[in-house]
């Protein structure tokens, strides 16, 4: 019996996250925000300001500066930062962190900040490779007397003829390449390529002109390469400065048992010294001066920036002034509040005034009922949920009265309740049932403060 097996695809279903519907800032060609575009609704002023920031980043004129997205909870600050990253594309580094991520028992908080700073700075390295590619027409090693004496002879040079579709060349190669050619078992009629920079030689296969030479042969026949024998190829690699730091701080390698055991064990989080970073900066500057590499300042996004303490803000002050620094985008939903680490000092957004004066502040405003209604429609389409107009009005009412997050979280449970009740669409009854099953923050707080809620308190 012939075995037939089904090949299953390896594609995964992507989880619908809170900002899956955001595809960009939704600006037209003049940089003016449309009322509803790319998953965004409202916040036209903030989106236009972020569009200007994106243009400055792409023009490499914003490095070493800071932006603060300030507004209440649920006004789209994280969505704006995500839209900035999507507008920039994959070639410009975008490193998102939260303010509480930097606190660790193993590593200093300033070290974690610097690591993320270096992650947000990219380096575009251009390398030009010279390649000789063609069918071997001649292979002649030139010998000479051994300079050390004796009867033996040594190979001084190797003459090799290569033929391509557009012409042929005769090359005189170093004797070290002869060893590589011997290892590859290259003979006349084989198609090979030789890298001029490294001297690496690779046998591609046998020329298809010799395909009828033998009846039985386990050879791979390839056509003669197109174009000239001598070709130049430009290879562009994108790396971050943190990748270079890690590669030099913890070099991999070693075939002894201790090295192999060290690679298997969980690596301990260690600090990268300032001396190593300064050496890497020197090498990077040298490459930039030579035109081999190009620095690409990216974006470091710090959400919940009020969670940073005084020491972190002092360090950020210094880091922003360094010659190699990214664009720092912070987000905070606090008003006048105490600064962490110096609670007696009250400042706007929980950020010290000296650091706040460095930032361009983009405010976000609360959504009106009509905008919340549109957001509910977009989210229902994204989550694949059918909903009636009356139910949209009811959910939007919760968004105005309670919060946008709470009303959007009701969509999926309401769709499950609608299916249980034998309906394809979410109706007002399903929303009301969800409201009874799931409390919002205000009702929960009111319940705990009442006499009925005393039994919940231990």
Curated annotation (Swiss-Prot):
<dbReference type="GO" id="GO:0031011">
    <property type="term" value="C:Ino80 complex"/>
</dbReference>
<keyword id="KW-0156">Chromatin regulator</keyword>
<dbReference type="InterPro" id="IPR010339">
    <property type="entry name" value="TIP49_P-loop"/>
</dbReference>
<dbReference type="InterPro" id="IPR003593">
    <property type="entry name" value="AAA+_ATPase"/>
</dbReference>
<dbReference type="GO" id="GO:0000492">
    <property type="term" value="P:box C/D snoRNP assembly"/>
</dbReference>
<keyword id="KW-0234">DNA repair</keyword>
<dbReference type="GO" id="GO:0000812">
    <property type="term" value="C:Swr1 complex"/>
</dbReference>
<dbReference type="InterPro" id="IPR041048">
    <property type="entry name" value="RuvB-like_C"/>
</dbReference>
<dbReference type="GO" id="GO:0043139">
    <property type="term" value="F:5'-3' DNA helicase activity"/>
</dbReference>
<comment type="function">
    <text>DNA helicase which participates in several chromatin remodeling complexes, including the SWR1 and the INO80 complexes. The SWR1 complex mediates the ATP-dependent exchange of histone H2A for the H2A variant H2A.Z leading to transcriptional regulation of selected genes by chromatin remodeling. The INO80 complex remodels chromatin by shifting nucleosomes and is involved in DNA repair. Also involved in pre-rRNA processing.</text>
</comment>
<dbReference type="InterPro" id="IPR027238">
    <property type="entry name" value="RuvB-like"/>
</dbReference>
<dbReference type="InterPro" id="IPR027417">
    <property type="entry name" value="P-loop_NTPase"/>
</dbReference>
<dbReference type="InterPro" id="IPR042487">
    <property type="entry name" value="RuvBL1/2_DNA/RNA_bd_dom"/>
</dbReference>
<dbReference type="GO" id="GO:0097255">
    <property type="term" value="C:R2TP complex"/>
</dbReference>
<comment type="similarity">
    <text>Belongs to the RuvB family.</text>
</comment>
<dbReference type="Pfam" id="PF17856">
    <property type="entry name" value="TIP49_C"/>
</dbReference>
<keyword id="KW-0804">Transcription</keyword>
<dbReference type="GO" id="GO:0035267">
    <property type="term" value="C:NuA4 histone acetyltransferase complex"/>
</dbReference>
<keyword id="KW-0010">Activator</keyword>
<dbReference type="GO" id="GO:0006281">
    <property type="term" value="P:DNA repair"/>
</dbReference>
<dbReference type="GO" id="GO:0005524">
    <property type="term" value="F:ATP binding"/>
</dbReference>
<dbReference type="GO" id="GO:0006357">
    <property type="term" value="P:regulation of transcription by RNA polymerase II"/>
</dbReference>
<dbReference type="GO" id="GO:0006338">
    <property type="term" value="P:chromatin remodeling"/>
</dbReference>
<protein>
    <recommendedName>
        <fullName>RuvB-like helicase 1</fullName>
        <ecNumber>3.6.4.12</ecNumber>
    </recommendedName>
</protein>
<keyword id="KW-0539">Nucleus</keyword>
<dbReference type="Pfam" id="PF06068">
    <property type="entry name" value="TIP49"/>
</dbReference>
<keyword id="KW-0547">Nucleotide-binding</keyword>
<dbReference type="GO" id="GO:0043138">
    <property type="term" value="F:3'-5' DNA helicase activity"/>
</dbReference>
<comment type="subunit">
    <text>May form heterododecamers with hel-2/rvb2. Component of the SWR1 chromatin remodeling complex, the INO80 chromatin remodeling complex, and of the R2TP complex.</text>
</comment>
<dbReference type="GO" id="GO:0016887">
    <property type="term" value="F:ATP hydrolysis activity"/>
</dbReference>
<keyword id="KW-0378">Hydrolase</keyword>
<keyword id="KW-0227">DNA damage</keyword>
<keyword id="KW-0067">ATP-binding</keyword>
<keyword id="KW-0805">Transcription regulation</keyword>
<keyword id="KW-0347">Helicase</keyword>
<feature type="binding site">
    <location>
        <begin position="71"/>
        <end position="78"/>
    </location>
    <ligand>
        <name>ATP</name>
    </ligand>
</feature>
<dbReference type="GO" id="GO:0003678">
    <property type="term" value="F:DNA helicase activity"/>
</dbReference>
């Amino acid at each position: 019996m012939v075995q037939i097996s089904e090949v299953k695809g390896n594609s995964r279903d992507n989880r619908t996250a809170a900002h899956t519907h955001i595809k960009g800032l939704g600006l037209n060609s003049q940089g003016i925000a449309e009322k509803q575009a790319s998953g965004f609704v409202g916040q036209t002023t903030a989106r236009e300001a972020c569009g200007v920031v994106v243009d400055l980043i792409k023009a490499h004129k914003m490095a070493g500066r800071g932006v603060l997205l300030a507004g209440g909870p649920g006004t789209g600050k994280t969505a704006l930062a995500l839209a900035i990253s999507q507008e920039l594309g994959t070639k410009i580094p975008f490193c998102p962190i939260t303010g509480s991520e930097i606190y660790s028992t193993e590593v200093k908080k300033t070290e974690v900040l610097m690591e993320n700073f270096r992650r947000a700075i990219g380096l575009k390295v251009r390398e030009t490779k010279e390649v000789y590619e063609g069918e071997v027409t001649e292979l002649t090693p030139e010998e000479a007397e051994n300079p050390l004496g004796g009867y033996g002879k040594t190979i001084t040079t190797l003459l090799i003829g290569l033929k391509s579709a557009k012409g042929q060349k005769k090359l005189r190669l170093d004797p070290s390449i002869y060893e590589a050619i011997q290892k590859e078992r290259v003979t006349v009629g084989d198609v090979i390529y030789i890298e001029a920079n490294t001297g690496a030689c690779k046998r591609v296969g046998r020329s298809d002109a010799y395909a009828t030479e033998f009846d039985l042969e386990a050879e791979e026949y390839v056509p003669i390469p197109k174009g000239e024998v001598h070709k130049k190829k430009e290879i562009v690699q994108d790396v971050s400065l943190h990748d270079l730091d890690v590669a030099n701080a913890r070099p991999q390698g070693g075939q002894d048992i201790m090295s192999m055991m060290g690679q298997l064990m969980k690596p301990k989080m260690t600090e990268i010294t300032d001396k190593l970073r300064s050496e890497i900066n020197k090498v990077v500057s040298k490459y930039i001066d030579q035109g081999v590499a190009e620095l690409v300042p990216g974006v470091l996004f710090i959400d919940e920036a009020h969670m940073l303490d005084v020491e972190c803000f002092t360090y950020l002050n210094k880091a922003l002034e360094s010659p190699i620094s990214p664009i720092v985008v912070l987000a905070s939903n606090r008003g006048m509040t105490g600064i962490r680490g110096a609670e007696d000092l009250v400042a706007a957004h929980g950020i010290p005034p000296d650091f706040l004066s460095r930032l361009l502040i983009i405010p976000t405003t609360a959504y009106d009922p009509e905008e919340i209604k549109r957001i509910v429609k977009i989210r229902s389409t994204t989550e694949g949920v059918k909903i009636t107009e009356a139910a949209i009005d009811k959910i939007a009412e919760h968004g105005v009265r309670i919060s946008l997050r709470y009303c959007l979280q009701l969509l999926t449970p309401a769709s499950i309740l609608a299916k249980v009740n034998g309906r394809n669409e979410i109706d007002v009854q399903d929303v009301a049932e969800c409201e009874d099953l799931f409390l919002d923050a205000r009702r929960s707080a009111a319940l705990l403060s009442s006499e009925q809620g005393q039994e919940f308190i231990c």
